Design a protein with these regions (language model features):
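Hydrophobic alpha-helical bundle signature of multipass membrane enzymes
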Residues: 1-117, 138, 298-327, 331-341, ...
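Actinobacteria-biased recognition of intrinsically disordered, low-complexity terminal regions
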Residues: 1-8, 199-272, 325-345
Length: 345
């Protein structure tokens, strides 16, 4: 799990710089994104009002308050390690966005946009804050709630990102990069041990895991295990019964229980939910890829209305795709296999 977290974090960081290289440093990339901004004005009266409302209601301070509430809930549930790593992820993501935007990345002036300063706007600060809240929610969730948290977080982050695009606040690459920055930090938190728990047969969980994490990830642990390990069903024949038959019956009962446990079924449901989120993201990325190739090969025809709208649709589809895939990838770092070793009554 830790290695996969480090790999996902590095992959997100690499994709951010790829976005910058393709859509900011290259002239054609800037032309395509300028077309996407122009295309967002087509039919804007249908969505711009709702987008502005969302951006005004869920402002940067409001998003910060939301993150604080999520972290406080985590502390109240005694998920201290997860809450600490969530703080690291949120603070690191937002500081990284500001550093990337103002100090590390730059935007060559190809005389394409009307902005006099032609300032770099990658990544989007609003989308970073919204995605940070989503990542904090996922990090603080137990295994049985992470897929649901990913769906909620993806919807929130995508809505914020799309709103900045619809209102011409940001270009598509700005939004996509802002979706990746917090996920990179979330994956780094997992690599650092945010979701670690004692493995089956190893040392007992840390003190903080006796609270919320033990209740969610190891339900009924106190009933299933005693001082000497997992309880075995009592022999129906009493102390004088056949000890061999009793032992075999107990072993069969212990191996049958996990397959019918509601907790295990819940975990399976979460895996299915995460798979559906992945499929939605993959489908959106397929649409974005097909449209993007078509638009990229028509960079000289970007004054045509259909090409302008296709550029905008490409960016919107890519925002949905990356938002879903990034959240699903973070949840996929969960050690689902650990649940198979949980002996529940």
């Amino acid at each position: 799990m830790r290695l996969r977290g480090a790999v996902l974090s590095a992959a997100c960081a690499g994709m951010i710089f790829c976005l910058w290289f393709v859509f900011v440093l290259s002239r054609r990339g800037q032309v395509v994104e300028a077309a996407a901004l122009e295309g967002s004005k087509i039919g804007a009266h249908y969505v711009a009002g709702h987008a502005r409302t969302l951006l005004s209601v869920v402002s940067m301070p409001a998003a910060g308050v939301l993150v604080a509430i999520i972290l406080i809930i985590g502390l109240l549930r005694r998920s201290h390690r997860r809450a600490a790593w969530a703080v690291v992820a949120v603070v690191g993501a937002n500081l990284s966005t500001q550093a990337l935007k103002y100090w590390i990345l730059w935007r060559p002036d190809y005389d394409i946009t009307a902005r006099m300063d032609n300032a770099n706007t990658l990544p989007s600060g609003h989308t970073t804050m919204a995605t940070s809240a989503a990542v904090a929610l996922i990090l603080l969730s137990g295994r049985r709630w992470r897929a649901l948290s990913a769906w909620a977080g993806a919807l929130f982050a995508i809505a914020m990102g799309y709103s900045t695009l619809a209102c011409q606040w940001h270009r598509p690459s700005d939004v996509i990069a802002a979706l990746l920055v917090p996920v990179a930090w979330g994956a780094l938190a997992v690599a650092g041990g945010a979701w670690d728990s004692a493995s089956y047969g190893g040392a007992p969980p840390a003190a903080e895991e006796d609270g919320a994490e033990r209740d969610e990830d190891h339900p009924d642990a106190d009933e299933a295990e005693g001082p000497e390990g997992p309880k075995r069903p009592e022999s129906p024949e009493g102390a004088g019964g056949d000890s061999t038959a009793s032992t075999e019956e107990a072993d069969r009962a212990l191996h049958r229980a996990p397959t019918t446990s509601p907790a295990i079924l819940s975990l399976r449901t979460q895996r299915i939910g995460n798979a559906l989120l992945t499929l939605l993201g993959a489908g959106s990325m397929l649409v974005a890829t097909v449209l993007g190739i078509w638009v990229w090969t028509r960079a000289d025809e970007l004054v045509a209305r259909r090409v302008l709208f296709a550029s905008y649709a490409t960016g919107a589809a890519a925002v949905v795709g990356v938002g879903c895939l990034a959240m699903a990838a973070l949840v996929s770092l969960t050690d689902w296999g650990a649940a198979r070793h949980e002996r529940l009554p």
